[in-house]
Amino acid sequence: MSPATVLDSILEGVRADVAAREALVGMTEIKAAAAAAPPPLDVMAALRQPGIGVIAEVKRASPSAGSLAPITDPAKLARAYEDGGARIISVLTEGRRFQGSLDDLDAVRAAVSIPLLRKDFVVQPYQIHEARAHGADMLLLIVAALDQSALVSMLDRTESLGMTALVEVHTEQEADRALKAGAKVIGVNARDLTTLEVDRDCFARIASGLPSNVIRIAESGVRGTNDLLAYAGAGADAVLVGEGLVKSGDPRAAVADLVTAGTHPSCPKPAR
């Protein structure tokens, strides 16, 4: 029987890929590598800087859009993002649908000095230690991909390694689950991962119900400064931008435009 949703299909592939990697590098070895890695950078300090932060993403493809950009040199792209003023760089490491890899994370870590988010579908504790071993400071946890006990344990493990969890939600119910699990940073994805449909009002609806001490990140739909300002007005502390940057002719300038808008005196301020 075929998987019921797009997310189910993605997770099926992820589990197979994790098992293959763990067969090559066991849990004991990856834990040791994580422990030996340089300490993680302070993600919360980066997110709490004045203005609306920009998280710039290294993203070759997606299930909804297909191929976006070849990105033969992720380190060069990451340096352009950093030069443009990005606070954090997101690196997609899922290979089947997003054409990413841990090699990309390694290359970016060696190239920049700002925090890194590993963006993947985390379903096994192994992936958390793997992220830390490859230099991640922040890790995506998708509520829709985890039952509540797994979400709680994955969040605890992420924080125990000194990383910050970006807990992704798409509905008010998922936001409630994220808060109950202890999420300090919540990302709202306007795209439903089970159907790939987009609900652009999703961020404003969910963000308005979050406590002021929770960092709110808008995760999709930013094509330019108007989108950033709209999300800022709805309570965003930061925006995550991928497709709009990798398809731009000048990624550094594209980031700089967003950063300028997000730090301009006229930009709505976060609620916290």
Curated annotation (Swiss-Prot):
Annotated source species: Mycobacterium ulcerans (strain Agy99)
Transmembrane segments: none
Pathway annotation from the record: Amino-acid biosynthesis; L-tryptophan biosynthesis; L-tryptophan from chorismate: step 4/5
GO BP, sorted A to Z: L-tryptophan biosynthetic process
Keyword Lyase in record: yes
EC number: 4.1.1.48
Catalytic activity: 1-(2-carboxyphenylamino)-1-deoxy-D-ribulose 5-phosphate + H(+) = (1S,2R)-1-C-(indol-3-yl)glycerol 3-phosphate + CO2 + H2O
Name of the protein this chain belongs to: Indole-3-glycerol phosphate synthase
CDD domains in the record: IGPS
